[in-house]
């Protein structure tokens, strides 16, 4: 597990996102392309304002992923929702899906072991945005690096 400003660990290849051509070869990509062809004037974005609906949609997309999952979270706490999401992401990685996680380090106290365990999986990459260098006392880093930690 590394912060975004550090080099990737030795022995691990640098990953990149899927190209649009690769995305169109997946089941979800084909379905999205068909809908886009039917409605070229629309963006394809749909706002999920209900948190339960949004969580269910993320879980379902993760369960159907075939090639890659890129997840980015600003608020990440060690609660039931996070446990369920981590389980779903782990199951995807076990199916051979490449999972890349970008998590804001603010508010992740007590989760270093879970993130390290996930990052140890060959198909999972965990990256921390705004990482606190002094891990045991993140509050100290938050106070001494206020400008950087709040960008």
Where is each model-derived feature located?
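HKD-type phospholipase D/PLD-like phosphodiesterase module
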Residues: 14-15, 22, 27, 34-68, ...
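Aromatic-capped interface at the extracytoplasmic side
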Residues: 7-13
